[in-house]
Amino acid sequence: MSSERRKLTIPQLAAVVAGNGLEFYDFLIFGFFAIQIGQCFFPGHDATGSLLLTLATFGVGFVTRPLGGAVIGPLGDRIGRKPAMLFCFGLMGFSILGLVLTPSYASIGIAAPILVVLFRLLQGFALGGEVGPATAFLMEAATPERRGLYVSLQFATQQAAILTAGLVGMLLSNLLSDQALADWGWRVAMALGVLVVPFALILRRRLPETLEHKSETAFPRPSRAQMRIGFFAVLTLAAATVATYTMNYMNIFGSHTLGLPAAETFGAVVVAGSCGVLFNPVGGWVSDRL
């Protein structure tokens, strides 16, 4: 990328990382409110059975995440990072809105959980496709001496999403009764992400394209050494995501298994997310100097 295209403004940088953060926020809200969502869409089971069905529905989103990465990643290499990010973010907004508006099991019966599974599949596909182009955009937009810092912002905003989701959950659990949370409170938490989607799309439409080569350019096959490095990088990233999934499950375990008040379990998530927001950029900054 030319030197002038490296001069990414703060609003443009915020548009990339904020979009990623918003997508993780809504993805995680579903897990944070799994107990309440289970009561809405799987009411015919006991509390444990309802929770397990909800967690299974949550897990469905992870099935399509690799597919989203495999499809959108190469597509972004050909048509550009910006179109790929716009498509993924629009699809994410559509799937979130679908989840918010899906009627309960009491209203439309078995169609309700079927719709939830469908929207979760779309949500997972969009999130899986978003991460690659957004991370590549940050790498291509950064100068060599700031590349680690720029890319670390991608992961810092994921932690910010956990922090924000925890704060929203803490606020709603303090203001609403358990029944209100199950009836409509979780929809409010998820709808907050939908409200920001139009503004984020506008910001992303104004982003410069960072992909230099033309779509018809042939891509060389990666060498064996490059594939080995990529393999170990994937393992490292997979290990790092364990912390994110632990924080996602922390609220469910605390409320359902330990019997802790929801506000306390959300508070633990807030603390963990705050640490991630602070230390991810520090790690990126250090990597630029090693």
Task: Tell me what each language-model feature is.
Residues 30-31, 226-276:
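Extracytoplasmic gate region of multi-pass secondary transporters
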Residues 43, 90-109:
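C-terminal ends and interior cores of transmembrane alpha-helices
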Residues 170-174, 194-212:
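C-terminal membrane-cytosol helix-exit motif in multi-pass small-molecule transporters
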